[in-house]
Amino acid sequence: MSDSEEHHFESKADAGASKTYPQQAGTVRKNGFIVIKNRPCKVVEVSTSKTGKHGHAKCHFVAIDIFNGKKLEDIVPSSHNCDIPHVNRTEYQLIDISEDGFVSLLTSDGNTKDDLRLPTDETLVAQIKEGFESGKDLVVTVQSAMGEEQICALKDVGPK
């Protein structure tokens, strides 16, 4: 291969990184995260049963889906691995809200992010719209996990 050849690679945002990582079920704690039925969840309750006649101690997880708020449960042997989602929270400045429910956000490097909808939480949507319409300088927190993103919090950083 000669030096004059150039190779162009398409950039992918996640660079092929795994959306989850394994963790032993017995070490997952309340307020941690877990994947149940292929959904990223926050653990609200963990209970363990003792080893029985046939096998392992078991962990019973009760968790809430971090994007749609649904309650999910799972029972896993405590010595087995379960999937834990990579959950990230990023703050963006709100620039605009479009008629069709999408938001324009300003990233830390000065670019705009236009692919996010308003959240499903009605009270949060009302706070965002009210603050935006009254000209406040708003910063939204976007939570992302397993290829999904959603606005989960709002901060007023003062008047524009």
Swiss-Prot record:
CDD domains: S1_eIF5A. Belongs to the eIF-5A family. Translation factor that promotes translation elongation and termination, particularly upon ribosome stalling at specific amino acid sequence contexts. Binds between the exit (E) and peptidyl (P) site of the ribosome and promotes rescue of stalled ribosome: specifically required for efficient translation of polyproline-containing peptides as well as other motifs that stall the ribosome. Acts as a ribosome quality control (RQC) cofactor by joining the RQC complex to facilitate peptidyl transfer during CAT tailing step. It holds the Pfam family eIF-5a. One of its GO terms (biological process) is translational elongation. It comes from Zea mays. The keyword DNA-binding does not apply. The keyword Protein biosynthesis applies. Residues 1-22 are annotated as: Disordered. Keywords: Hypusine, Initiation factor, Protein biosynthesis. Transmembrane segments: none annotated. One of its GO terms (molecular function) is translation elongation factor activity. Residues 1-13 have a biased composition (Basic and acidic residues). Lys-53 undergoes hypusination, a unique post-translational modification that consists in the addition of a butylamino group from spermidine to lysine side chain, leading to the formation of the unusual amino acid hypusine. eIF-5As are the only known proteins to undergo this modification, which is essential for their function. The modification Hypusine is found at residue 53. This is Eukaryotic translation initiation factor 5A.
